[in-house]
Amino acid sequence: MPSNKKRVLVAMSGGVDSSVALVKVLEMGYEAIGITLKLWENIDKKTNKVIDSDCNSLDAVNGAKLVCDRLGVHHYTLDFIDLFKTKVVNNFSNEYFSGRTPNPCIRCNSLVKWDALINQLDVFDADMIATGHYARIKKDGEKFQLHKGLDTIKDQSYMMWQIEQKFLEKTLLPLGELSKKEVRQIALDYKLINANRDESMDLCFVVDNDYKQFLAEFVPEKVANISNGEIVDEEGKKVGKHSGFTNYTIGQ
């Protein structure tokens, strides 16, 4: 138990993991505030309406708020769409058109989520942030080490490797010692609305995980300039044809 009751900003996605992270923060004796980062909106070009995706869909935001209400915690939704576009989505597009396959989740964690949450500490007069990632942070002298979560199947430490020391110092990872099964059970014990919610492994800003369609809508002029061509091996031998180099990744 903390000697003084500190305030923690808990990142709330609307899923079961972040909800149980909030539960654990409260059980540890901290005061908590739930924070949902609004990161993206996909707009249907025909209807001009927002298409739900995993990046803070209406259901997800409402789910986060309902969990906070149930646990007696204030909840806020903050708009970081511009930052997410600049740091993550633009890079995602540029990498594909440079012949590389990006990993947007790593950039999102280090350049958007942690940066945004840490910068909100002063706004909310808070001391720490907490997330529902399956990883652990250990202090070694003056350094903070990032370790795998005990649930090796769910371990997310790889997605956090770029997070800076100054951010790790102010981060709690309440699920690092828990298994997914244990997290589900805690959610059921607390009768949380999302206890049985399915997990999503898709990129949160790409509808139906169709990155080709996403690029076609996000940068249509670039996609229009990509032509078909031949696939050759390292010795220059033709081994097939391709429908545009952005549709393939190394080793495919």
Residues covered by each model-derived region:
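ATP-dependent adenylation/nucleotidyltransferase module used to activate substrates
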Residues: 1-161, 172, 181-183, 188
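AMP-forming adenylation/ATP pyrophosphatase catalytic core
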Residues: 130-138, 142-252
